[in-house]
Amino acid sequence: MPGVRWVRIVGVACAALSALALSVTSASATSRIKDLANIEGVRQNQLIGYGLVVGLNGTGDTLNNIPFTKQSLQAMLERMGVNIRGATIRTGNVAAVMVTGNLPAFATQGTRMDVTVSALGDAKNLQGGTLLVTPLLGADGNVYAVAQGSLAISGFQAEGEAAKIVRGVPTVGRIANGAIIEREIEFALNRLPNVRLALRNADFTTAKRIAAAVNDYLGVKTAEPIDPSTVQLSIPPEFKGNVVAFLTEIEQLQVDPDLAAKIVIDERSGIIVMGRDVRVATVAVAQGNLTVTISESPQVSQPNPLSRGRTVVAPRSSVSVTEDGRKLALVKDGVSLQQLVDGLNGLGIGPRDMISILQAIKAAGAIEADIEVM
């Protein structure tokens, strides 16, 4: 219908936003200690380096626009015995890049690690490029690894005179096993008098259960919870000098972790994730939609032939209001997550309204869980 305008007014007793999906998570009955905690001090270390990628098919940096690429190229050639100071360099096959990687815990000299290569200048594509020898430094400024190799690019770019297609990110690549570790980080595990376990999700109950499981297994009080994220293990005399064997037995013990009631909401993607212990107190929920339709049908009045009249347009509008019939539902005290979801679905509420309704129930003080909005 010409000239029709739609105005949609949504009245939601609790609230209404959008949600694209609703996910329900439930933790398994038990988990291994190695899945719940890390050994304190045992972690990866970030490495970074600056280098050059060569062999690009004209898709590298524009040397006149990116001075650091030109300076790096000149310095590299001078180390090779080629002096080009003052000469005009015209090449599009070189790109300045940053190289990053994670040094694994207990990595030894000669082992390899993956690295990621990212363009630093205005290079369009790193496809087909080769990273030249690049030292990788730690936060202390020492060189821990050296990277070199051919890049693997997941994205691509193709262009013509009047069109261009880009898929993925062609200016970021990866070299599998592209760096050789040259320096080790010393960590005397077998000399430690005690070991601390760092829980991935801090919780008083879980920390206490881990300590109890270890003490029950060994038959002596060896483990002690320090805080909700730390459990300290004293090395028994029979495992002195052999901490690896001690941890091998401990990390396989099964523990029932306790989870805090939490609802995680990602408003960008519309995803809702709820824990198993989410409970709701007594609350009434209603949701209704009001649709107002405004139709414009202008009428044209034409004068008689050979008359001195004028063509006149007379506006004509019609307004109609439609309200969806929705019920008021009472959610009783102590209902479970499944009952809450079933109740909301019974109201005819789709996933698009779930996020705001949950936020409104929380604002009313009727939901026993933390809501984290990402």
UniProtKB/Swiss-Prot annotation:
Main location class: periplasm
Annotated InterPro entries: Flag_FlgI
Annotated localization: Periplasm; Bacterial flagellum basal body
Keyword hit for Ribonucleoprotein: no
Family: Belongs to the FlgI family.
Purpose of the protein: Assembles around the rod to form the L-ring and probably protects the motor/basal body from shearing forces during rotation.
Record-given protein name: Flagellar P-ring protein 1
Organism: Bradyrhizobium diazoefficiens (strain JCM 10833 / BCRC 13528 / IAM 13628 / NBRC 14792 / USDA 110)
Biological classification of the source: Bacteria, Pseudomonadati, Pseudomonadota, Alphaproteobacteria, Hyphomicrobiales
